[in-house]
Amino acid sequence: MSKDIKDIKKDILDQFRAMEGEENDILPENWLIEEYLPFLNPYEKKDFEKAIKQLAAKGFLKYEKGVIPKLKLTEKGANLIH
């Protein structure tokens, strides 16, 4: 079953939750490149970009664009997952 943007946002926040993320914690690159992104189809990979932009627009995380995006939890994001 294909993931939509909502599912991808939930996956990202769930991963921060699983690592008991606090403000300024960064999602481990190895999780993204080894355990998550390889399992997304091309459409889901496009939605991944949209999902992180939406999470950033809502103030839940900050991200630096790159081959592997750097996702950093904000205070608002930390409050959401706890």
Language model features with spans:
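Short alpha-helical segments that sit at the start of domains
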Residues: 1-23
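Minor-groove-contacting beta-hairpin "wing" of winged helix-turn-helix DNA-binding domains
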Residues: 68-73
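Short amphipathic alpha-helical interaction segments
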Residues: 41-57
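Short, amphipathic alpha-helical interaction segments positioned at domain boundaries
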Residues: 76-82
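Short acidic, hydrophobic short linear motifs in intrinsically disordered regions
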Residues: 22-39
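Residue-level marker of regulatory loop/turn positions in helix-turn-helix DNA-binding domains and
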Residues: 5, 25, 44, 66
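A short, conserved structural fragment
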Residues: 56-66
